[in-house]
Structure formats: C-alpha cells, structure tokens
C-alpha cells in the first residue's frame, strides 16, 4: 500500500471515529435517564436520612457544613419543601404511606399511632413492602413511630433496628430484628445518633459483599434535634451565642388577630427567653453528630464505589418554633416555621448545586422511592414522584429545543386533628363573625327559655346558673326530671332482667339471705358497715353552692352506728334541717404541722396556719394576677372532679348487684329460653338499655382517664397543667447532659385542645399565601409576599366571594383521595380561581418570577427590626 493510500485510510478512520464519538455523545445525553451499563446494579441504591423536629426558618442548616457540602453543593436543594401536618407520628405515617392524614387516619401522636388498625390497614402498604418484594435489601435504623412498642417487626424490612416510643439519646430500648435491646448512658456504646450510623454502614457493606447485585434501601431516622437535646460530649461547648432563632416573629405577642392560643399567649418572661437561647444552642449541638453521620455515609459510598449509583434524600418530619409569637417551644402550628423542612436530593442525573422552586411534600417521598426503584405507583397514594423534577432538561444543541415547563402542583393541604362532631347548620354564623368567645356563646344560650328554669322541665338536660362572681355557666341537670323518660322505660322491664345475662356464681354450702332479710338483720344487730370509720372525725367536707369547704371540729366527733334513716327513702331527722347557714370563718381549731405544706410551686402553709408566698407575688401585680388565675383554674378543675366522683358514687350505690339465692330456681332461669327472640337477639327493651349502658361506659372511661391524670399531677406536685391546654414544666433536672439548666423551674403552655385546623398553602408565579379554617370557626389568611413572617392576619381584607372560593378549594383538598385529586394543577392567574374569581382585586403586589420567590434574608428586614424588642 502506497503512502497516499495509507494517508487516506488514516484520514477515513479519524473521521469515522469522530462521527462515532459524536453519535455516542448525543445518544448519551438523549438517553440520560438510563443508567450506564458498566454499573454493578441495574437499579440504584436509596438512602433516606430523616431528622426529628428540624427547622429551616430558624437556621439549623447553617451549622451543618458537611451536610450542605455533600447534599446542597453535590445535589439539588428544594427551597419550597413542606410537610402536610406538623406532628411527628402523623407526618411519619404520611412519609411511609404517601398519604394525607385524613386518608391514613393517624391524627395525633397518640390516636391510631402504630395501633392495630394502622398495622392492619396501612403498615402493610408502605414503600418498604413494595421494594422488599422486588429484590431490594431493606433496612430501618432509628425512630419509627411515637407509640411503637417493639412487640413486632413491621413488614417489609429485612434489617430492623427500631427505637421504642419517642426520641431519646441515652437510656432507651431498641427492637433489633424482634429482640429488645436496652442501652444505657455510655457515649461510646449508647449514643443513638452514632449507633444507628455505625449499624447502617455495617449493613450496607455486608449487603454489597454478600449480595453485590442487589440494590439497598436504607432509612436512617435520627432523634436529633428532638428533646431531650442531649449532644455528644465533644460538642457541648459549641454555639454559646446562638441567635438564629430570633426572627421578627420572636416574642411577637399577644396576637389578637390570630386563633385562640395566639390571642392568650403573652410576651415571654426573661426566664423563658433565656430558655429559648439555651434550647437553640442544644439543638444545634445535637445536629453536629448528624452532620458527622452524613459524612460517614458519604465516605462509605465512595469507598464501596456506590456513590454514583445511590440516591440520597435528606429531610425532616416537620419544623419547629422557639419563641415565635411568644410560644416558648413546640410545633403543631400551620405557620412556616413548623411546616417548612430541609429537603435535599443527590443521585444519578441530579444536577449539582441547583435550586428547585417546585413544591415538594412529605407525601411525595413514598412515590418517589417507588419511581426510583422502577415500580408502579399505587393509585391510592396522594403524593407524586419528584423524579421528573430532577431532570435538568438541558438542550444538547441549538436544534434541540427546551421542553415545555413541567406542570406541577401549586397548592397543598395542611391539616391537624379531626372534627369529632359535625357542625350544625345554625353555626355558620361563627365563621362570619370569625370568632365567638365562649362567654358570649353561653350568654346567648342563657337567653333561651329552656335553660332559664332550674331543671324543672321534663327531659331538661341543662340549666343556666350564675356563680359568685356573676359569671354565667351551664350546669347539667341531675335527678328525676332529667331521667324521667329512661326510668319510665326501665319500669316496663321485668325485674329478672336487672340481673344481667351472666349466670350466678354461688359458693357451695353458704346460705345467703335475701336483700330484705339482710337489711332486717343489719338493723336488728346494729351492724356496723365496713366503710364506717372507727376513728374519731376531726373534719368534715361541706358543699355549698357547688364549692367544697373542709371544716375542722372543735371536739372530735365520734362515729355513729348506722340507723334506719341512712337508707334511701328514709325520713331525715329534724335536727339536720335546722342546721342554719354555714359560715366559712371562725370556729376553726388551730392546726399544727411538723413542716410547711407546699400548696403551689410558689405558696406554702406555715406551722402557725398562715400562708406565705414568694416575694415576687407581693411586688409584681402581673405575677400576682398570673398566680391567682392559676389557683382559680386548679380549684375549678378539682371541683369538677369531685362532682364527677360523687355522681359516679351515687350511680354505683343505685346499681349495686344483688346476690343470688342459690337454693331457689329463679323465674329468670326457668323462662330464660322463652325471653329470647329468634337468632339469639336481645329483648328490645334490654337492647335499648344496653346501648345506653355502652354510652355511659365510654363516658366513665373518659372520666377515669382524666381522674388518673389529675391524681398523677397531684402526686408529682405538677400544678402547671391548665384545663384545655398543653403545658410543660422545665426544671434543673430536665437536661442530664451539658450544658445544664440552672435557673430553676418554670411553666409554659404550648398548644390548646381547640388547635384543630385545615389550611391551604399556595405558591406560584403570582401568589404566595396561607389560608386556614380552624375547628372553632376562626379564619386566617397571610400573604407571604408582603408578610413573610405571618405577623398580620389579613383575612378581613378579602372579599366574601374570594373567601367562598378559597373555602371550596380547601374542602376539595380535605376530601381528596389519590394523586389525581390531591394535586391541583397551576391555574391561569389572570382568571384567578377555577370558579371564575379573580385575585387581582385584593393583590397588593406585582407579579414575580420564580427566582424572586426566595425568602428574604435577615439583612433585608432592617425596617422590621427597628423599634423591636425581644
């Protein structure tokens, strides 16, 4: 072959190689959704890192430099990530199932949290079950659900290391593959963050060594920064001047334009503010171990060669607030600090360092994990896969045009709690007035004729009374007038039905008298009942106008024998009727005690029968008012408990079962078979009574539960709790690791029983608002483009038509099921809502594009800080 032909061959080979390389380059970018063939696994590994109570608004991510370097600089940061409920167990249930709270029915951290109903209906349909059935090596490490007791291993997990109950860092119990494992307080062996990190790394390495071609799914669920905020010893001195939590809404209280708990929460006291500073510091310290954990996992993926074939997701179950709006700490509010969470994704085909403005939710995690694994997403999941949002959509050349902007949701539901009773049609007026105080509602009810009589009407259940302070109250009617209907019904039932359906239990050889015989024998022998005290009586309790007074007796009253007048229906002695009026002053004997008696956390009764309180109560009018209000609440609570106990005692006296006469065949036994209808159903009279008994038993169970809580608080000297409020007491013994709290105990309330709400959060190119409806009928609306920290409720600026349209949208979200119903698409903003309304009439801002939707920094809020005092 000559030189010219040789040169021609070389030139042809060069051109062919260039064309082939270009073709390979084009095909690589056009098919970038597919994984490279030289990887060991066809399907990628998935690692979900979940933290507990981690905020975004208070700057917790600012100190996690390792995590931000790995996830933010090396992956995608979703700047509009939210949860659909700011509660631990409901949010975690949504993460596992991909469903809204109203579809998995876990409304609180107690109700239906890891219950048998949850296990039967929803736990068998988590993302772990689907991936485990298709060959994934699944593993869970850390906190699961608040009420998980370790009695079983949830389905779908090959490796299970689950924390029992709520978050702890020391002295906890794990369920390791069905075996309970207790841990102590040794940092090197027991610190939970490090332990689950080491276990997860060991599991991943072992899986890749034994099953190199099987993908791995791991969930690493940290307890940090949840309480009790125990940090690792090496980080206990960091952040002495932490102040990221001091936002414009910090100590912004009271808020008369917001819902109930916000209106009655005043500014924090100095001890509360000092607590918030230390709490923020300790939370950041616990996150340092999570930061180390992320670096350890990253290095493990690099060493095993699985980094480029692994999706890593970092997020939290909900946010947190520390001092915002005067609330010392907590979550459960529908505001940004409680529903915004960190959300980072790193993995194949994810552009490094990008900011994604689309709304992502906790319900999107389950469908996203299924989509990454190549599985079909069940239609009953409410969330959507965000995998398509991670596609960079970069054009290959100028002839490859960019695709149309992806259609994505612009609104979602935020819900907490459920409405136990349906609202009546006549209560719609409460929404129009936005709020009707309780005293006003009671006052309106007392205007009705049926509540003005003193329980004299047949079937009357309530009466209106006025207490000593002139305050109107509704009291429940008790006695024959209210029970007339039920007693008339019970008289129609034969006597043998009162004995119940259970057979008598008789002891052989024992002869028992009838009820009349026992009473006759009791009176004849002057028998002393077992409940009569044999010792002298030194004081008696007298109830006057619903209040209980303990009156001391000068001379010890001797116990009396029971006489015939003690039985129901017997005439009272004349002496008892002429007792005269009772006076609570004078005639009381001197009482001496060895030590002062602690009545409240600030007041004592001394040996000389005088009361002594803290000096602050005598100097500060506000402290005096607060403590007096606290004592009034305690007295009212105890009085209600005593009334309930007396009602139960009276019921038990009337419903005492009669003993059986075992030597005589009763009429009930002889005719037992005749009294039943076909199909073994109960007699209709008895059936009606049985349904009433069930209702009564449910009420009794609730009363007993409240009584147990009351007794427990009294035993623990807990005088912090208020009726209808969720409160906590903090003292020097709460934190067992440095830095320690040394400023003494204090009480604070964080939420209320009526804090049930449904909200719609909307973010798009033109709108950025939150609209809420509370169970009390209260409405809230915040325009976050003009009020990013939700300082002012702007619901009064909206027209009635706009409110109605927002209400319709919210009701649709509250009842949605499946991703087709629960993900409303972006609407035409020129037309407003889909019903034809327009937002232009109340918008006070100009349209903004996505890059301008970022939250303003603290430096740009100088005007808000002027004149503000923390």
From Swiss-Prot:
Glycans are attached at residues 65, 112, 132, 149, 171, 198, 241, 561, 583, 608, 717, 754, 764. Residues 416-715 are annotated as: Hydrophilic domain. The keyword Secreted applies. Pfam families: DUF3740, Sulfatase. It is found in: Endoplasmic reticulum; Golgi apparatus, Golgi stack; Cell surface. It catalyses: an aryl sulfate + H2O = a phenol + sulfate + H(+); Hydrolysis of the 6-sulfate groups of the N-acetyl-D-glucosamine 6-sulfate units of heparan sulfate and keratan sulfate. The active site is at 88 (nucleophile). Residues 560-588 are annotated as: Disordered. Its EC number is 3.1.6.1, 3.1.6.14. Optimum pH is 7.0-8.0. for arylsulfatase activity. GO terms for biological process: bone development; cartilage development; chondrocyte development; embryonic skeletal system development; esophagus smooth muscle contraction; glial cell-derived neurotrophic factor receptor signaling pathway; glomerular basement membrane development; glomerular filtration. Belongs to the sulfatase family. This is Extracellular sulfatase Sulf-2. It comes from Homo sapiens (Human).
């Amino acid at each position: 072959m000559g030189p010219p032909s040789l040169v021609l061959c070389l030139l042809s080979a060069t051109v062919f190689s260039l064309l082939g390389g270009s073709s390979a380059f084009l095909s690589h970018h056009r098919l970038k959704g597919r994984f490279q063939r030289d990887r060991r696994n066809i399907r990628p590994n998935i690692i979900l890192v979940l933290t507990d109570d981690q905020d975004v608004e208070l700057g917790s991510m600012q100190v996690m430099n390792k995590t931000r370097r790995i996830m933010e600089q090396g992956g995608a940061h979703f700047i509009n990530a939210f949860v659909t409920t700011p509660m631990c167990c409901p949010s975690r249930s949504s993460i596992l199932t991909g469903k809204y709270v109203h579809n998995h029915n876990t409304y609180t951290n107690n109700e239906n949290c890891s219950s048998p109903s949850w296990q039967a209906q929803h736990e068998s349909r988590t993302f772990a079950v689907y991936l485990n059935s298709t060959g994934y090596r699944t593993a869970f490490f850390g906190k699961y659900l608040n009420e998980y007791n370790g009695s079983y291993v949830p389905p779908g997990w090959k490796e299970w290391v689950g924390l029992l109950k709520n978050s702890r860092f020391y002295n906890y119990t794990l369920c390791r593959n069905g075996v309970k494992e207790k841990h102590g307080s040794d940092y090197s062996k027991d610190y939970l963050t490090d332990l689950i990190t080491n276990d997860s790394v060991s599991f991943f390495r072992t899986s890749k060594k034994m099953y190199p071609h099987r993908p791995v799914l791991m969930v690493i669920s940290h307890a940090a920064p949840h309480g009790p905020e125990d940090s690792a010893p090496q980080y206990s001195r960091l952040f002495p001047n932490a102040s990221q939590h001091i936002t414009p809404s910090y100590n912004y209280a009271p808020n008369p334009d917001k819902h109930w708990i916000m209106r009655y929460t005043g500014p924090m006291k100095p001890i509360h503010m000092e607590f918030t500073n230390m709490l923020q510091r300790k939370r950041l310290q616990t996150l340092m171990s999570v930061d180390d954990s992320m670096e350890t996992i990253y290095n493990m993926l690099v060493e095993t060669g699985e980094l480029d074939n692994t999706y890593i997701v970092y997020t939290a179950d909900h946010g947190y607030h520390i001092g915002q709006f005067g609330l010392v700490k907590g979550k459960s509010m529908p505001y940004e600090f409680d529903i915004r969470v960190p959300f980072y994704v790193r993995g194949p085909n994810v552009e490094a360092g990008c900011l994604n403005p689309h709304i992502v939710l906790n319900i999107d995690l389950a469908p996203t994990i299924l989509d990454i694994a190549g599985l079909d997403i069940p239609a009953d999941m409410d969330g959507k896969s965000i995998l398509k949002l991670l596609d960079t959509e970069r054009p290959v050349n100028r002839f490859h045009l960019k695709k149309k902007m992806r259609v994505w949701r612009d609104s979602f539901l935020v819900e907490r709690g459920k409405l136990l009773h349906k609202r009546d049609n006549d209560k719609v007026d409460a929404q129009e007035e936005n709020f009707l105080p309780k005293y006003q509602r009671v006052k309106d009810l007392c205007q009705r004729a049926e509540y003005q009589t003193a329980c004299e009407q047949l079937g009357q259940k309530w009466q209106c009374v006025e207490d000593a302070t002139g305050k109107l109250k509704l009291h429940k009617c008790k006695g024959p007038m209210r029970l007339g209907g039920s007693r008339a019904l019970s008289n129609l039932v034969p006597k043998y039905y009162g004995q119940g359906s259970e057979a008598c239990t008789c002891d052989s050889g024992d002869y028992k008298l009838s009820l009349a015989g026992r009473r006759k024998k009791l009176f004849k022998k002057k028998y002393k009942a077992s409940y009569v005290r044999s010792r002298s009586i030194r004081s008696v309790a007298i109830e006057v106008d619903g209040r209980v007074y303990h009156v001391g007796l000068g001379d010890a009253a001797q116990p009396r024998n029971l006489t015939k007048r003690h039985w129901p229906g017997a005439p009272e002695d004349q002496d008892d009727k002429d007792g005269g009026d009772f006076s609570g002053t004078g005639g009381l004997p001197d009482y001496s005690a060895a030590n002062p008696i602690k009545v409240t956390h600030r007041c004592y009764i001394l040996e000389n029968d005088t009361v002594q309180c803290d000096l602050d109560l005598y100097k500060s009018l506000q402290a005096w008012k607060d403590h007096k209000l606290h004592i009034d609440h305690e007295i009212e609570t105890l009085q209600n408990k005593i009334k309930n106990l007396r009602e139960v005692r009276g019921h038990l006296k009337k419903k005492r079962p009669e003993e059986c006469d075992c030597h005589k065949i009763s009429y009930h036994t002889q005719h037992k078979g005749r009294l039943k209808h076909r199909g073994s159903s109960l007699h209709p009279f008895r059936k009606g009574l049985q349904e009433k008994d069930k209702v009564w038993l449910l009420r009794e169970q609730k009363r007993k539960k409240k009584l147990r809580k009351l007794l427990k608080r009294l035993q623990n000297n807990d005088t912090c709790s208020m009726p209808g409020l969720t409160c906590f007491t903090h003292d020097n013994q709460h934190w067992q690791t440095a830095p320690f709290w040394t400023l003494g105990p204090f009480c604070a309330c964080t939420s209320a029983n009526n804090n049930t709400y449904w909200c719609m959060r909307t973010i798009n190119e033109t709108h950025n608002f939150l609209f809420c409806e509370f169970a009390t009928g209260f409405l809230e609306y915040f325009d976050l483009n003009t009020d990013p920290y939700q300082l002012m409720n702007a619901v009064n600026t909206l027209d009635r038509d706009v409110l109605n349209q927002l209400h319709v949208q919210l009701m649709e979200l509250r009842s949605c099921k499946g991703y087709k119903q629960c993900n409303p698409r972006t609407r035409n903003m020129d037309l407003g809502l889909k019903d034809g309304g327009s937002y232009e009439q109340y918008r006070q801002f100009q349209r903004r594009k996505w890059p301008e939707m970022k939250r303003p920094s603290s430096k740009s809020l100088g005007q808000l800080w002027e004149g503000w005092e923390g």
